[in-house]
Amino acid sequence: MAKLMNKLVDSFEHDEIPDVGCVRAVLAELVLTFLFVFTGVSAAMAAGSDGKPGDAMPMATLAAVAIAHALAAGVLVTAGFHVSGGHLNPAVTVGLMVRGHITKLRAVLYVAAQLLASSAACVLLRFLSGGMVTPVHALGRGISPMQGLVMEVILTFSLLFVTYAMILDPRSQVRAIGPLLTGLIVGANSLAGGNFTGASMNPARSFGPALATGDWTNHWVYWIGPLLGGPLAGFVYESLFLVQKMHEPLLNGEV
């Protein structure tokens, strides 16, 4: 165990030692993720999505939940973008870490903060709601775990692809409002996948309700899917679309 821990410590670069900025960023992820999960789960509870896991939600209920998640994601990502990047999501954090945009230590701290925040939000909601049913992400009736996995991969891929295009690509013309626009793809994906998998796209968003209710049925789908889709989107965008120079300038005398 000691050797394993030493290898783990050695795997972190020296410039990853937490500083004041890192601590602030982790605290921002804690607060922002708490608010996002609290808003999303409470909206789902208020909208009446408390049927049996796997039951299809009426379109009005699904739309209400999607709008709440879209607004919360857009506003909170914008609010925290200048502090922590406004990840709110382990899939975003891991995807950016794999592509080298954040350090490994910061990624670990972010994910820990996100999971803690989600858990606290859902436990508090159970207390504040008087024990109302906490909706958990579940596969729709007739949807196999593998089908759900692929759906979560695709939904998370689209989320991260849009993030790269609007925020990380230096050629983007909407970087200033990119975080706010991110909420639109969250809402669209929630409508598209809500009755298939619940459209998690976010392991932290799924973790809190599962912990609060003790319902871990097919919970792995909501980890593996997003954690595959996020890095895949980064790889595809950076490999095919994130071109540093559109063309090389001609030298004098060349035609």
Swiss-Prot record:
Entry's free-text remark on domains: Aquaporins contain two tandem repeats each containing three membrane-spanning domains and a pore-forming loop with the signature motif Asn-Pro-Ala (NPA).
UniProt cross-references to SUPFAM superfamilies, sorted A to Z: Aquaporin-like
Topology relative to the membrane: Multi-pass membrane protein
One GO cellular component term noted in the UniProt record for this chain: membrane
Motif (NPA 2): 202-204
GO molecular function, one term: water channel activity
N-terminal signal peptide: none
Family: Belongs to the MIP/aquaporin (TC 1.A.8) family. TIP (TC 1.A.8.10) subfamily.
Keyword vocabulary terms for this entry: Membrane, Repeat, Transmembrane, Transmembrane helix, Transport, Vacuole
GTP-binding recorded as keyword: no
Listed name of the protein: Aquaporin TIP4-1
Highest rank taxon of the organism: Eukaryota
Function: Aquaporins facilitate the transport of water and small neutral solutes across cell membranes.
Protein encoded by which gene: TIP4-1
Disulfide bonding pattern of the chain: none
TM region(s), chain numbering: 25-45, 61-81, 108-128, 148-168, 176-196, 223-243
InterPro entries attached to this UniProt entry: Aquaporin-like, Aquaporin_transptr, MIP, MIP_CS
Subcellular location, record wording: Vacuole membrane
GO-annotated biological processes: water transport
Motif (NPA 1): 89-91
Lineage: Eukaryota, Viridiplantae, Streptophyta, Embryophyta, Tracheophyta
